[in-house]
Amino acid sequence: LIAAVTLLFSSFGRQLDIEERVLCHAMGVAYEDGEYKVSLQVFKTQGMGSETPLDVSQSNIQTVNCSGRTIRDAIESCQYQLGREVFLGHLQIICFSKNVDFSSPEEFFSFAIKDKNVFLGVELCMAENTAEELMNVQLTRGTMSSENFTQVIKMGVKNGITVECRLIDLLSCIRSPQYVAMPVISIKEPQGDFSDGKE
């Protein structure tokens, strides 16, 4: 199965410009009080309500948190909050809180299955505490935390201390139920100050 990622998609029969979209790089999902809580880590563009140019010394990401009856509903609420279409074609990682139920993966991941732009090789992980906490990690070195998460997972796989779990791996279990291992990520306080060269 080969999944292709495309940067072009249409809405109501017309192509959306980059200024009309918000690029989502990472997503956190939790289940609280009968609703899904979604945290989207999105890239700040110059036109997002401000004429101020981007500060290239900062990470230039922001997190939007919304809830809904389904994950798709929560994403749509985030779009209303942002005032723009959320594009999931750049999604690199999806993190889950431990209270999420994966017993019906086809229904659970319908938001991704029905979106032709979502890359089925996107990394999946579990949060040691909450997915929202992971999505709110602020970096100051110009890289996105989604990139750091995927790098941590790949390094763990290389060193034999964890396993990789991609969306396509989990979806492959829909018709043949089985256990799927998923890496767990936790937030650790940095030792020392950035000025000392420690992270």
Each model region followed by its residue ranges:
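Membrane-proximal alpha-helical signals and transmembrane carboxylates
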Residues: 1-199
